[in-house]
Amino acid sequence: MFGGGGGLNPRKMKQMMNQMGIDLEEIDAEEVVIRTADEELVFDDAEVQLMDAQGQQTYQVVGEPESRERGDSGSEDDSETESGGEFSEDDVEIVAQRAGVSESTARETLEETGDLAAAVQKLE
């Protein structure tokens, strides 16, 4: 597809990516967790790369995940919103930074919505 030969020279590949406006960054991640309705996929010591292509960020995770069951996913979400304080300071900080609001506003919105993405979307 990219022509004959044994592959691209890494320097040439980097030059081509720069010309296309693509930045690649290694992230020193200790752990990556992907939560679904039924399970959590936990990557310990995963290789994570952030690719920024003209403002669109894509994360690539390479590693072997450990699968854990989540249990009652519906009641877990309800308890987070009712009890408050179930969100870590990192969660609150992420919402505050993404939405450009104070941490107290971010915390209140997290408690209302029960979800990071929904909180950011509501505040934007």
Swiss-Prot record:
Family matches, as SMART domains: NAC
PROSITE patterns: NAC_AB
Name used for this protein in its record: Nascent polypeptide-associated complex protein
Family affiliation: Belongs to the NAC-alpha family.
Gene Ontology BP term (one): protein transport
Quaternary structure annotation from Swiss-Prot or TrEMBL: Homodimer. Interacts with the ribosome. Binds ribosomal RNA.
Gene: nac
UniProt keyword annotations, A-Z: Protein transport, RNA-binding, Transport
Molecular-function GO terms, alphabetical: RNA binding
Coiled coil: none
UniProt-annotated stretches for the region Disordered: 53-124
Superkingdom field: Archaea
Alphabetized InterPro entries for the sequence: NAC_A/B_dom_sf, NAC_arc, Nas_poly-pep-assoc_cplx_dom
Domain named NAC-A/B: residues: 7-74
Keyword Transport set for record: yes
Acidic residues biased stretches: 74-93
Known function: Contacts the emerging nascent chain on the ribosome.
